[in-house]
Amino acid sequence: MEAPRGWLVISVLAISLASSVTEDVCRAPDGTHGSAGIPGRPGRPGLKGERGEPGAPAIQTGIRGLKGDQGDPGPPGNPGRMGYPGPSGPMGPAGLPGLKGTKGSPGNIKDQPRPAFSAVGPNSVSRDNVVVFGKVITNQENVYQNNTGRFRCSVPGYYYFTFQVVSNWDICLSIRSSRRDQIQPLGFCDFNSKGFFQVVSGGTVLHLQQGDQVWIEKDPSKGRIYHGSEADSIFSGFLIFPSA
């Protein structure tokens, strides 16, 4: 145990001596900076920074360049929506006649209108000189009015009208028709200087529309018709065929 204690004493003395020597040495002034050394190697790339704020638009100072060449056509687009119908075009030329159709079934004549009338008289003469044949013999479809002496068309078509009037005086009669508010007369006259009984007759074919009227009219100064039991005057008419 004596040896370790001796080494401890020696160590303490050595430290004390070194401290004394250091305190006795004078401190020298600092030296000047030396020349720059050689640049070191580039360091490793740093991390990617955040995106910066947009820059202000630049002021265009150059001259606008020429128009470039036309680019290649792009791919076709999708079909658009259907538009509104356009106006009707002009009528085209007539086509070729079609084939002849098959024969139809026979019609029923009973279902066809057959206007016809016949009346005798006269019973009277109206103020407008219309001869009224008041005694009706036939009045199919009720087309003749025996109180006015007028036929009224109910079926458009072609009609035949006739009259036979007995007189022993000069007489002038006319078949008159109204169509579209226009009066169309057809006159017949007979002169009797001897006072014998004679028959004045007339007839015509008329194309009538629905609502047209036909009647017999006398001349105011030459229209004396015989009234008696020996002879009758008659006014008749009927449809020949209807209009297509």
UniProtKB/Swiss-Prot annotation:
One of its GO terms (biological process) is complement activation, classical pathway. The modification 5-hydroxylysine is found at K48, K67, K100. Residues 110-244 form the C1q domain. The keyword Cell cycle does not apply. One of its GO terms (cellular component) is collagen trimer. The C1Q subcomplex is inhibited by sulfated molecules, such as triterpenoid sulfates, heparan sulfate, or chondroitin sulfates. Residues 31-109 form the Collagen-like domain. InterPro entries: C1q_dom, Collagen, Collagen/C1q_domain, Tumour_necrosis_fac-like_dom. PANTHER family: COMPLEMENT C1Q SUBCOMPONENT SUBUNIT A, EMILIN ELASTIN MICROFIBRIL INTERFACE-LOCATED PROTEIN ELASTIN MICROFIBRIL INTERFACER. Core component of the complement C1 complex, a multiprotein complex that initiates the classical pathway of the complement system, a cascade of proteins that leads to phagocytosis and breakdown of pathogens and signaling that strengthens the adaptive immune system. The C1q domain is the ligand-recognition domain, which specifically recognizes and binds the Fc regions of IgG or IgM immunoglobulins. The collagen-like domain interacts with C1R and C1S proenzymes. This is Complement C1q subcomponent subunit A.
